[in-house]
Amino acid sequence: MPSTLQVLAKKVLALEHKENDHISREYYYHILKCCGLWWHEAPIILCFNGSKQMMIKTPIFEEGILLNTALMKAVQDNNYELIKLFTEWGANINYGLISINTEYTRDLCRKLGAKERLERHEVIQIMFKILDDTTSSNMILCHELFTNNPLLENVNMGQMRMIIHWRMKNLTDLLLNNNSISEILTKFWYGIAVKYNLKDAIQYFYQRFINFNEWRVTCALSFNNVNDLHKMYITERVHMNNDEMMNLACSIQDKNFSTIYYCFLLGANINQAMFISVLNYNIFNIFFCIDLGADAFKEGKALAKQKGYNEIVEILSLDIIYSPNTDFSSKIKPEHISFLLKNFYPKNLYIFDRCKPGLYYP
């Protein structure tokens, strides 16, 4: 093993990464290559994220990836020098067991301290920790490292459900209805990319999984990504009617103002939208529907009574105090919708708060 001084020197080189005026770029790069600080035909840059976690940057991973993720990729690529380097820098060599594909690499990991195999719960734990990093680079890497990985074939599906629900919420059951673990995982990474509008990752999955267009639209509606929804709609890749789209926008999570408004402008039934919001106990969505002109209070109240939602019954019983918000426009442009609804608070929720102070705390 290299000395502590050698490890420190490599870290300093990777952290500072400043070209010297007194030596040529070619010679500087030659030094980095000799030190093993080279990946994807370019220098390796070492940095730290806001949580003080070590990150690796290269031209392919411009946003940076966590050190343990970088180790997993190096193991998958059978890049022995980088496996040793990342382990020297503190990567957990057991993460490498996720992506081993040759006996030589397995032997190297053993020599570096890896255990013989991962338990099922450890595989899930590693996947959970890797998901902390919501970038395009990481979602693409998650797909490459986990989706067709035999270690995921026998995981505890109860634990898998918990991880999926953490990110997908009420889309979890729909996602788990798929037949294979590889399809579940592919849609999972794709869904996270849409949820956080990770454009490079969205494009990556779109190019490779054209048959998952409906899933992409479902995620855009459910997670309030009006930009991606509009992109799919204008290219005629949405094969749902307006009311089906609105149902998804209202049901998965609260405060989905942008996608609800988009569907409303397309002509979706706003009273039906309020009913779906009632059934899913999405209070902000209910008030937003009222702002947009929903007025089927009697029917909505009946639904709330059936479900035992007493607070919603109280809200809809005060229909006499509500009125549509006249500040909206009819422009179906994502940038306009995003600007209009930035920091938005439903007008009728203000009215309700004044009438019934303390009943509901948003």
From Swiss-Prot:
Could you give a single Gene Ontology term from the biological process aspect? taxis
Which superkingdom?
Answer: Viruses
ANK repeat boundaries on the chain:
66-98
Give the intrachain disulfide bonds. Answer: none
Q: Name one Pfam family in it.
A: ASFV_360
Keywords attached to this Swiss-Prot or TrEMBL record, sorted alphabetically, are: ANK repeat
Family, per entry: Belongs to the asfivirus MGF 360 family.
Instruction: State what this protein does.
Output: Plays a role in virus cell tropism, and may be required for efficient virus replication in macrophages.
Q: What is this protein called?
A: Protein MGF 360-19R
Q: What organism, scientifically named, is this protein from? A: African swine fever virus (isolate Tick/South Africa/Pretoriuskop Pr4/1996) (ASFV)
